[in-house]
Amino acid sequence: MFKIRTMNTISPLGTQILEKHGCAVKPDIENPEALLIRSADLHSTEFWPELLCIGRAGAGVNNIPLDTCSEKGIVVFNAPGANADATKEMVIFEMLLASRDILGSIEWVKSIAGKGDEIPALVEKGKSAFAGPELCGKNLGVIGLGAIGALVANLALEFGMTVRGYDPYMSVESAWRLSRDVIHVDYLDEIFRTSDYISLNVPYTESTHHMIDAAAIASM
């Protein structure tokens, strides 16, 4: 029986599939052949001889010591794009939150609850504090047009935004998914100069370290 240790909470919908194929999936299995993780940091983990592979239920693998795994012949795999729709929705949600003080307005409404006849006057007086710009007509810069970035760019167009995208390594598959209305730019500086909002959709690597630095922020 193939033994898999889960080091984070994994949906039963996933673990049940493994169990149906004869795998033992538990958080306390000794010397498993596989690890299934999400956020667990394995950089200080001493790997055992039986370990064959590590699977991450997510896109990035920065919490896995890839060099060590390569030396020991441990296969590492992830799930790129699995969280793309959820992340796309959260990006738009965060832009809406940044445009208007929605959370503050919720707390303010709670604060005037129970004030009866005073509420209409309080609303009229206080509502202007929570006004904000629409996303429609604003400029969004998307850095990285992969599984997540392409979805963010396409959805932002539906909100009436002008979308510029930067990705010198865009795959053919991503290009097919991307709307023709996304403006492609060749330099990050154009994203920084023209954007009201920026969505950064790249993995953290040595090449992306300090991609957004003091100079980039100063040019915004």
Label every model-predicted segment:
Residues 149-150:
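N-terminal Rossmann-fold NAD(P) dinucleotide-binding loop
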Residues 1, 51, 136-139, 214:
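Phosphate-coordination loops involved in phosphoryl transfer and adenosine-cofactor binding
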Residues 145-146:
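Glycine-rich Rossmann-fold phosphate-binding loop(s) that bind the pyrophosphate
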Residues 40-45, 168-220:
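Rossmann-like adenosine-cofactor binding region
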Residues 153, 157:
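Gly/Ala-rich phosphate-binding loop of Rossmann-like dinucleotide-binding domains
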Residues 2-5, 9-12, 23-25, 84-86, ...:
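Structural/interface elements that position substrates and couple domains in central-metabolism enzymes
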Residues 80-139:
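Phosphate-binding beta-alpha-beta segment of Rossmann-like dinucleotide-binding domains, i.e.
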Residues 1-79, 193:
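An N-terminal-biased, well-structured beta-alpha scaffold segment characteristic
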